[in-house]
């Protein structure tokens, strides 16, 4: 780093600088000392060479290899493939966190992964019609976040959104949850006439996806993300187990959805 951009003569001068060489020598010694101590610092971790880690990485790498060839990162063209891309990367991130001994972070990320699997499950089951509605709510979110430059277009979006909300009996205070969860009204799995169904994740997305058995797991992961006492005083080994089991549970369902989707739309045969 010190010699970057310097010519040979300047590099030779650096080699004569004893103070600099001593400083570099100290840094190198500290680096190797820290590397030596690293296994002790992360005693509660999943080894990257363990079957638990390597199996998950192998499954995810194969899915990523297939998906990366067809995913365009354009929701109007490859919405489901884009969502699979994010899910795969989130799952790989959880594996890396477990390797580093970041059990709390891994379990907190499982929460995001579970949210994503519920959403993609409903969107695949709902087909093109539901996916179009979901895309519309992405536009609503962009308008709400003032990400659309055309003010007239933004105004028209809000007029349309407010009309839809009024039709559903929602008030202005419900706008944020309508933007995020309003697409559920178009899902056959969401019963808007049943008071048990609500516009949120737990009583909306999760319930409609028929994965409510994970609500307790989700709640525990939510506590971790809010720096509750669980975050400060949790036992690392406990959350390593939860994150690992949770990851493989999601991975089993996601892998099944992924290959069925790819086969149904002939994606695998196109590669």
Q: Where would I find each of the regions flagged by the language model?
A:
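Short capping loops/turns at secondary-structure boundaries
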Residues: 99-102, 106, 133, 150, ...
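Long, hydrophobic/aromatic-enriched structural stretches that serve as scaffold segments
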Residues: 58-121
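Predominantly late transmembrane helices and immediately cytosolic-facing juxtamembrane segments
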Residues: 124-128, 132
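Secondary-shell segments that build the walls of catalytic and ion/ligand-binding clefts
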Residues: 1-71, 136-271
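A generic secondary-structure signal for well-formed alpha-helical elements
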Residues: 117-125, 228-229, 265
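Short, solvent-exposed helix-helix connector turns and helix-capping sites enriched
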Residues: 49, 102, 126-127
């Amino acid at each position: 780093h010190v010699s970057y951009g310097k010519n040979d003569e300047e590099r030779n001068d650096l080699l004569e600088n004893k103070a600099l060489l001593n400083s570099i020598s100290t840094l190198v010694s500290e680096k190797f000392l820290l590397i030596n101590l690293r296994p002790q610092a992360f005693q509660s971790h999943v080894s990257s060479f363990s079957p638990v880690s390597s199996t998950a990485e192998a499954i995810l790498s194969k899915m990523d290899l297939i998906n990366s060839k067809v995913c365009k990162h354009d929701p109007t063209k490859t919405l489901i493939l884009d969502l699979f891309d994010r899910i795969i990367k989130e799952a790989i991130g959880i594996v890396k966190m477990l390797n580093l001994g970041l059990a709390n972070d891994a379990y907190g990320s499982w929460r995001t992964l579970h949210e994503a699997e519920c959403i993609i499950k409903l969107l695949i089951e709902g087909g093109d019609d539901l996916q179009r509605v979901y895309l519309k709510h992405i536009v609503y979110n962009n308008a709400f976040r003032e990400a659309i430059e055309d003010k007239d277009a933004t105004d028209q979006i809000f007029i349309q959104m407010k009309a839809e909300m009024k039709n559903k009996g929602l008030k202005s205070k419900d706008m944020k949850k309508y933007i995020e969860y309003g697409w559920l009204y178009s899902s056959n799995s969401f019963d808007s006439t049943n008071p048990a169904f609500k516009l949120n994740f737990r009583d909306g997305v999760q319930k409609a996806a028929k994965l409510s058995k994970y609500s307790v797991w989700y709640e525990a992961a939510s506590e971790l993300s809010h720096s509750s006492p669980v975050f400060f005083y949790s036992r690392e080994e406990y959350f390593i187990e939860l994150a690992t089991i949770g990851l493989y549970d999601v991975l089993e369902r996601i892998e099944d959805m992924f290959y069925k989707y790819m086969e149904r739309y002939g994606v695998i045969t196109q590669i």
